[in-house]
């Protein structure tokens, strides 16, 4: 029914009276009367109504002819069910269902269209609208409109919906068939009812088969219908032309899918994408609901062929450089063989045939030529690697019982399939920790032959002039118990040119470090008297003393210019110049190794007691070998050292009868007393953590270098690790194994640490540090002798009790390391320090956390944290983790035997003197006064 008629049936609609000259003019009752006159009476009646109603002539001759040709009688029962066996018009398919005879129809205007092949989901927003217009003929280099349509069909993946008035282009139709059959794309086509016969003729020419119809739906629809009062009607035609693809693209315009429209007619199309496509989506569903199906059963079709496999084009790899191509091919992969897909498929076929137990002949497979291996041009002339040369070797753990051999490495010739032991090259793997027994025997025989060749002392002097390189291969030092096991060293004679070169290097070293050689020589002279007594009891030590005397007599020689005597042994900066006799090796070879306790008892009975520093120097614990030549001997295990503190505690009882030292300090030199230098600054030292032994209650300390943390089970000697240089530590560093006292110094000042060797005074100080330079001069060696004798006079003490005397005297200050008073030069030092910083004593007296009247140590992490060192009240009030019963003395003193009362008097003297003796030449790095800050 026409729109004007539908509007008249609406009760709420009001036809506003408008003239023909307005844009809103649409419905006209006069035009309806003229049209009915044309359909009932003809053309003359039409013109008579137009003149009588005084309206415009709105129909052309072409339109009059089309309306008259489409006129048909209206039968109200034409839409009902037809009797069985009655067929409808040609071209109308069975898809039209039977109409209902009831009042309420089965179908309504709002029915859902039957899109059985699928339809893309509706999206709330389809994106930004974009439009592109293409012309026919093309302009500005644009592609042809037919090319644009075909490309869009070939790119479709989901659905293609076409609404067309004339569809006779066979090329476009073949593209639709291929999309539906090969790519399984749903294809819907809606055509004009009057032109469907031309479409069916094209289908006969397209050589269709039954597979093309599976994903193809063809339907027809016409225009709106106009009903008259004389039971007649006529229908319009479908003039819409658009194509909807995948729910996101659409093409519309004047272009019809015909040859003439793409070649000779002028048309245009508009490609749309985005949100505007939603209009085409709804319009197609409405047209599909109103359309009728078209049957294609009268079109001759062939059977559906087998689907052709989709040929995937082999991608040619891009050319790579020669260097990369050589890296990609690794010869390791030639040893790996994996099963291909064909091999696994053949195995499955065999298994299935065995299960079925059917004797079926296998189908002959077409012979396929093996694909040629593709090689990079850079790899054509390369040799194939023999992977047997790259096979790894392995260790067979089959050594003989009781031997030092851990196993063998077998090297097998790859050309021999089953090699025997005679055809293998074996490499023995020895245990380095126990493989020195045979080596000692060989070296002992060599040394015996060497001693036999030396007939007299003249021959010995000739051989000693030659440089003999010694390589220590095994050394076990136990300095804590006076026990030392040394093995022989390997000797290699060098040419005379190397002798001259070595002597020059040694002389240069002595020139650059005169202080070090002087200090070591002075210490050795102090220990010569003790070595002579020891030489009478032990023949092995007598040899060492003779060697030391011989080396002292030859200090002028270039070969021995770099050697120094320490504890009866001659030590060189490059190598040890003395040759040990084979005596110790016989004892080491014949006598088995006993327990440590037995060895300690034997050594304590045979050997006389040694001084504390002398034992350390004798063990050469801090001598750093400067040998630069490569080691050719067997690997040397690390020497094992025992704690020094145990040895000192055990020998304290035997050192009580030794005479007190006589101080011989020079008046012109200000010595370093109580950790203070000549400028009034404090020699700050780091204190090591002490671990408490739960069984014995004895403190153990490591003798390792500063680069390693202290440990009770240290097996590291400073012969293998250099001492660390001066380091700085801030006050924020935590202190473990003790109470934390408040920091009494500036936070910005760094703390200087010297070395890491833990001396018997419980702070780090190496033997080499005793000979440091002060004001360009050497420290007085008398101080070293005084400290050594002070160690000898002390009583045996344990734990923290070592800092207090067990038997304090009345009216006399007690010194834990001796009974000597203050040295003459100490008062001059205190007066000099008081003149240096007059305001320092006042700041110390006002400080809290220590005893009033006693100086406060600048380093709270050093000696101040040792319980009972500087504050006996702390040791009395607070429990110490190191000892359970500390016994503070009535008059505590410093470790160097200086009472605190004397230090307090020196402070007052310093304050009285004022700034008269201020030294402006040098400013110390210690605590600054209030004015200096």
From Swiss-Prot:
InterPro entries documented for this protein: FAM83, SACK1
Residue ranges, annotated region (Disordered): 339-375, 450-716, 870-899, 911-933
Family: Belongs to the FAM83 family.
Low complexity bias (residue ranges): 702-716
Subcellular location(s) per record: Cytoplasm, Cytosol; Nucleus
Pfam families attached to this UniProt entry: SACK1
Assembly description: Interacts with SMAD1 (via MH2 domain); in a SMAD4-independent manner.
GO CC, one annotated term: nucleus
Signal sequence region: none
Stated role: Substrate for type I BMP receptor kinase involved in regulation of some target genes of the BMP signaling pathway. May also play a role in other signaling pathways.
GO molecular function, one term: protein kinase binding
Keyword tags: Cytoplasm, Nucleus
Major place of residence: cytoplasm
Keyword Cytoplasm: yes
Biased composition (Basic and acidic residues): 467-480, 503-514, 590-609
A Gene Ontology BP annotation from the UniProt entry: signal transduction
Superkingdom field: Eukaryota
Ranges of Polar residues composition bias in the record: 452-466, 515-531, 538-580, 651-660, 875-886
Keyword Membrane: no
Protein name per UniProt: Protein FAM83G
